Curated annotation (Swiss-Prot):
PANTHER family: PROTEASOME SUBUNIT ALPHA/BETA (PTHR11599). The proteasome is a multicatalytic proteinase complex which is characterized by its ability to cleave peptides with Arg, Phe, Tyr, Leu, and Glu adjacent to the leaving group at neutral or slightly basic pH. The proteasome has an ATP-dependent proteolytic activity. Belongs to the peptidase T1A family. SMART domains: Proteasome_A_N. Keywords: Cytoplasm, Nucleus, Proteasome. The 26S proteasome consists of a 20S proteasome core and two 19S regulatory subunits. The 20S proteasome core is composed of 28 subunits that are arranged in four stacked rings, resulting in a barrel-shaped structure. The two end rings are each formed by seven alpha subunits, and the two central rings are each formed by seven beta subunits. The catalytic chamber with the active sites is on the inside of the barrel. This is Proteasome subunit alpha type-7. Gene3D superfamilies: Glutamine Phosphoribosylpyrophosphate, subunit 1, domain 1. The gene is PAD1. Its main location: cytoplasm.
Length: 249
């Protein structure tokens, strides 16, 4: 197995590219990220590690703009993400200068996925150890979009999805609870999904909301705490209702 294990461009006899599978494992060990598409907004939420006491929290952002109308969150290796984000931003700017129009969300998703795929079959490089969630608004139709890419270069569109640590649990939660929502309800669904795996509440969650009119806005910690408190109150009320004795008719 060792021969196929080391060579990035060589398939194993049973059809595996082990370096790509190892990159997918790096994603599975990364912090959880979730994206939810609403009718008038799109929300990205990520699990963030506790920062050191003297660290500037503003320097640790996991949700970033690629363009005024497109944002990205990722799970996996942060250094790999920095390289991919910079390449994507340059492509967005180049497209504006060349075509004199902003990129569509699908266009930049295809570009990022193509770059990830290229690094699975080129010598002297290794696959990107990250999966991305890309959200934005189409500059022509104004409709919100959510896409995911993975280290193999595969991409697909979603109504809601998760990647990173315990992504299967989050995805199951979204499948059970997703419905077309708007405004604050979309934000609440994304945070509820993250709370399935984040045990420390709102302090270890980063959330950003994108709307067509206002672009991307990072939620303040106090806003996240207020929504988490609202979710906890709803859970407590639901539990109390279950335990309450049935009323006589």
């Amino acid at each position: 197995m060792a021969r196929y294990d080391r060579a990035i461009t060589v398939f194993s006899p049973d059809g595996h590219l082990f370096q790509v599978e190892y990159a997918l494992e790096a994603v599975r060990k990364g912090n959880a990220a979730v994206g939810v598409r609403g009718t008038d907004n799109v929300v990205l939420g990520v699990e963030k590690k506790s920062t050191a006491k003297l660290q500037d929290t503003r320097s640790v952002r996991k949700i970033v703009n690629l363009d005024d109308h497109i944002a990205l969150a990722c799970a996996g290796l942060k250094a790999d993400a920095r390289v991919l984000i910079n390449r994507a931003r340059v492509e967005c700017q180049s497209h504006r200068l060349t075509v004199e129009d902003p990129v569509t969300v699908e266009y930049i998703t295809r570009y990022i996925a193509g770059l990830q795929q290229k690094y699975t079959q080129s010598g002297g490089v290794r696959p990107f150890g990250l999966s991305t969630l890309i959200v934005g608004f189409d500059p022509y139709t104004g409709s919100p979009s959510l896409y995911q890419t993975d280290p193999s270069g595969t991409f697909s569109a979603w109504k809601a999805n998760a990647t990173g640590r315990n992504s299967n649990s989050i995805r199951e939660f979204l499948e059970k609870n997703f419905k077309e929502t708007s405004g604050q309800e979309t934000v609440k669904l994304a945070i509820r999904a993250l709370l399935e795996v984040v045990e420390s509440g709102g302090k270890n969650i980063e959330v950003a909301v994108m709307t067509k009119e206002n672009g991307l806005r990072q939620l303040e910690e106090a806003e996240i705490d207020a929504i988490v408190a609202e979710i906890e109150a709803e859970k407590a009320a639901a539990e109390a209702a279950k335990k309450a004795p049935p009323k006589d008719t």
